[in-house]
A protein has these predicted regions:
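Short cytoplasmic-facing helical segments at TM-TM junctions of multi-pass membrane proteins
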Residues: 106-145, 171, 175
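Glycine-rich helix-loop "coupling/hinge" segments at transmembrane-helix boundaries
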Residues: 65-67, 82, 159-194, 213, ...
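C-terminal transmembrane helix and the adjacent membrane-cytosol boundary/short C-terminal tail
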Residues: 56, 109-112, 116, 188-231
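Loop-to-helix entry region at the N-terminal start of transmembrane alpha-helices
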Residues: 25-33, 81-102, 142, 186, ...
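Cytoplasmic-entry segments and transmembrane alpha-helices of multi-pass inner-membrane transporters
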Residues: 48-80, 95, 105-113, 120
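Transmembrane alpha-helices
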Residues: 35, 97, 129-163, 189, ...
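Generic alpha-helical transmembrane segments of integral inner-membrane proteins
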Residues: 31, 35, 39-47, 96, ...
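Periplasmic/extracellular loop-to-transmembrane helix junction in inner-membrane transport proteins
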Residues: 1-38
Length: 231
């Protein structure tokens, strides 16, 4: 209990929040790297999952990346660190390996969840394959894709602490510095900040996902009615 109180005291000290190594700066670094990883992973996983889901080709890749979730991120980071050296390159690579599978799986599942009758009806009225993707399948998959983004973001925001393993970056510095100097109050305080960021981000993404699901259902109903009328 005394260590926990010391951690709260550490958090309540204004000096720990300011400066280049303060909580605010480290939090901004942490969130910035998380955002970068999710964006890069999305640029890879969303188009790939969309194409695989639409064409049915390359499904093995979804299974293979799903199996990659079992690979420990710290192990990937260690190997990447030996290869790429000190800096952000190694944690960026390791976090991409962590973030791509849930995004790819969610996108693939979302695209394939579109009723085949709806897709066939879209083809019957003359829509091209890109139009079917853009106007039918992708909007229908938006809810599941948002859930995948939420899952990937939470995993990354929790694991970005490992970036401090090879770089003086992010909230993980409080954990590693505290462990090195046996300043457990700093370690617990840093962990509390990470948890708070994760919970706040989860709440925001849950709200966005809920709204997307509502809009997706409305869009799907309107699209189905429109296709039926066209036929």
């Amino acid at each position: 209990m005394s260590i926990f109180l010391e951690a709260l005291s550490w958090l309540a000290t204004p000096a720990n929040w300011l400066g280049e190594s303060g909580i605010l700066t480290r939090s901004a670094e942490h969130l910035g790297l998380t955002f970068l990883i999710v964006v890069l992973a999305s640029l890879v996983a969303l188009p790939l999952g969309t194409v695989i889901g639409h064409t049915g080709r390359g499904r093995w890749l979804v299974s293979a990346t799903g199996a990659a979730r079992a690979v420990p991120t710290l192990g990937v980071l260690t190997l990447a660190g030996l290869w790429l050296g000190i800096g952000l390159a190694a944690p960026t690579l390791a976090l991409l390996v962590l973030a791509i599978p849930p995004l790819l799986s969610a996108t693939y599942s979302g695209i394939t969840s579109t009723p085949r009758t709806t897709v066939d009806a879209a083809r019957a009225i003359g829509l091209t394959e890109p139009q079917i993707l853009a106007q039918v399948e992708f909007p229908h998959a938006a809810g599941l894709i948002a859930a995948g983004v939420r899952s990937a973001t939470l995993q990354v925001i929790a694991t970005t602490t490992l970036a401090a393993y090879t770089a003086n970056y992010g909230l993980g510095r409080f954990l590693y510095a505290g462990l090195k100097t046996r300043d457990y109050a700093q370690m617990i305080g840093g962990a509390i900040v990470v948890v708070a960021l994760a919970l706040a981000t989860d709440a925001l993404l849950a709200l966005i996902a809920r709204r997307l699901r509502t809009r997706t259902h409305s869009f799907a109903d309107e699209e189905n009615n429109s296709l039926k009328e066209s036929l």
